Amino acid sequence: MRWIVLFASLAVAACATAQQAVPLPPPPATSAPAADTFRFVSDGPAGPGWSRPDEIARKYFHENLTALFERTLTLDAALPQRATLRWIFTGPRAGLTVELTSSRIRIAERYYDSMALYEGQGNFPEKTTFTDERQYTGDARTLTVIADSHLAVRVLINGQQILEAPLLFDLTRHQLMLAASRTAHQIVSGSLVKPNIKDATVTINESQVHQTMLGFGGSPSIAAYAELSDQGKRAYWQILKRYNLLLSREYPMGTELKPDLSNLEDLADATPHYYGDNFPNSELSSFDYSRHVLDLGGSVIYELWALPSWATVPNNGPHATDTWNKPIKRVANPNEYARLIVTYCKKAQAATGSAPAIVGIENEVDQPPEVFSSMALALRRELDKAGFTATKIHMADASFMFLGIDRATELRKNPEAWKTLDYSAVHEYDFQEFLANPDLYDARMNQMHEAADGKPFLATEICINDPHYQEPSYRIALAVAQLYHKNLTELDAVALMFCWLLLDVEQPSFAGSRSLLAPDRTRSWIPVPTSFQLRVMGAFSRHVVKGMQRIGVETGDPDLLATAFADAQNETLVVIIRSTPSRRLDLQGASHAWAEIEHTGLEDENSVAPFRTGNVIQPGEILVLSTIKAQ
């Protein structure tokens, strides 16, 4: 992980280079207009307010910061000796402070969202979690702080980068304070530079036609759904309809399933998915739930995880190991496995009127390649024999894309088995290796696209499960938004699915990182968003409906990510900006008149307004233009 390495390297660097001062370049000429000004007088009147009786009055900048930002201060003169200018950035959970003296620059990050952080001083809990500093020589006349899409914050003096630190949490406001002698007459003044706006052109090319979309969704925890009140269940289906999350990827009963499948809906046989201290919350089906999905025009995807013991046999083939290098002692019995799936399809058809639209071979569990091939062949044969010829099959999806590449490569060695598969599929947990630098994942995605050999691709599980990144911030969600874009444009994904649609947890970080929604026990058991992940997925899902085709679109800007979709009646454009400054968009090539525009960001939760020209997209924002009027 980039930031694990960075923490270690910074610690070493702090010791090795603590005495090496950085020579600054000459102060740059600045002609940018000022958004605001500040003036501190060290021996002037004390600031108003309670609890700081002799503090120099602070300067408060009355703006809300965008998710990504670049802000620059200019100083009218060199900072006096023994004076410290503190630039304080705050957010809902944590903040950072940049301190500038006449010879040193320092950054400190602190959390203040839990009483567990109280260390015995001050009137609120807080704990500093990161610090770094460097000495410099020269005349510091501009100070710049950049919160970028690489999950980092960078500090520049006179345009030269001096410090870089990890930044996972959101920042929303900022202020200045001066710490200086109250008995000396020192003046520190300057201005906050007004952020500029660049022009950008987005050109749609409808002659370039790519994949046809199936939709968006994820896995519901049926145990969590059962916890919802009647009001909560109604709200849940309204949310799924509003966000067009109508692909229901079942996480059905496996190890506890009886041979006749008589207990597949029995809540008493649910198993705990071990996120911390979770109660039993998974491996359960509900035909009532599936009926609701179908009534909304959605589809059910059925895939077993660990098989029941009665559907396995000892591995008498060549020695094989799983992902964790443990020997595979038992493998699937292809015929019994196929019987299980067909029995489920019959029960589903009887209860809901429809068999699953898609069946996956097996979720994450490793089988020798020849066993996966036998499972695919047996499943297709038995589905067809039972009349379920319309039910499609997707390949066994591995946890990581690099394993998915290997699986697809091995499966293609058996052309007959490969032919039975309608979709390629994989989970994308290895994206977290590149969360701070998403473009580095491109090579792996291109390899998967090649290995899929033209089969439509399903992104079957996307979420954050690395404990280093379980911060429920918009900044983390924005990194996942880039992954959605890359799936659509590099893998030609026809479906995007978050890990869980609904999940009940004990430790809250598992909710914000794993699930879009969770039951709120404090509000009559209604479903509520766990983080910014719901709105970010909604930026794609709400205006891209089943049957739309992805079409070509160009921006000429590597930090302006655009995807476009169209069918005979409608058109949708999704634009992500992952850098500063803001862009004023000139939209070209659309053949339909836009009906509405939707803003998604740190402040905007899929906020819809009538279309207008001259749209400006703010750093870190997702802008959607569509002919479809979403709910």
Regions found by a protein language model. Name each.
Residues 582-606:
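Beta-strand-rich binding/interaction modules
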Residues 554-591, 621:
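Carbohydrate-binding surface patches
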Residues 456-539, 551-556:
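Aromatic/acidic polysaccharide-binding cleft in carbohydrate-active enzymes
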Residues 23-196:
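Extracellular glycan-recognition regions
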Residues 336-358, 365-465:
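Active-site neighborhood of glycoside hydrolase catalytic domains
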Residues 608-631:
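C-terminal beta-strand-rich structural cap/linker in extracellular carbohydrate-active enzymes
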Residues 197-357, 361, 370-377, 381:
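N-terminal catalytic cores of secreted or lumenal carbohydrate-active enzymes
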